[in-house]
Amino acid sequence: PGPAGGGSVALLPMSQSNGSEPVTEPLTVADVVALLQAAAPPGLAEDWDSNGLICGDPAEPVRTVLLAVDPLTAVVDEAIGRGVDMVITHHPLYLRGTDHVAATDPKGRCVHRLIRAGIALANAHTSLDAAHGGVAAALAARLGLLGARPLSPSRLDPAQGIGRIGELEHPVRLRDLAVAVAAALPDSAPGLLVGGDPDATVETVAVSGGAGDSLLAAAREAGADVFLTADLRHHPATDHLEGGRPHLLCGTHWATEWVGLPPLAARLEAAAGERGRRLEAYVSEVVTDPWTLRLSTGS
């Protein structure tokens, strides 16, 4: 096994067609889950988290997968419309557990619709946040950060962990960095918020996709000039800014985590190909942020 519980992936060998051209057996749901967990080792996940197969038969074949941030109705609609065999989301369907999957609420209806359509559902949450090439690494890459390293290293593998911190190629004004970050993130109605002096010079940048309140102190201790994250609440943000740097860039939860999906799709396709299999991975562009319109307030 590799670091943080990443093990080898055992797949069935290729079969032969009439002794001539090789014909590959399709991957199974279990195979794709194994590839996913090789890319995002479960050992990197937080103790409170939920990762892995949510519904579906592990033995069913998989030729196409759809990657998305949230397992919501719109994503299920897209999966059924595309006719994919499996959906992989970043967020779990039942993070806090459940005592039923009856089709009496939206989550239960999603489960029933997926099962009726023969579509499996799996997820990789904080394991993907922390992994090499995961959400935080993708954010750092989009900003061109040099020497990116974990902001909060994993106990199991310090080379991986939640968040990343690195340096820009050269110092810039905060407002100019904000413009570049806004262009690097997928479009969503709330856009990007800036906290701090827009004309301040910044060079060391910390990033963490999704809710980042818990990493404000870590970003400061690491010497970041600016911290890009999402879901910053009023009191933690104002208390933090009262204490000085890092300045804050606050995107949306969906936008800051969506950036991890295209690299994951490429890794899954490549990993299947290395094993003589074919897998088509699509990335959903359905915006699952809850906010659909932003209006400026005041006169």
Name these PLM-found stretches.
Residues 7-299:
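Hydrophobic structural segments
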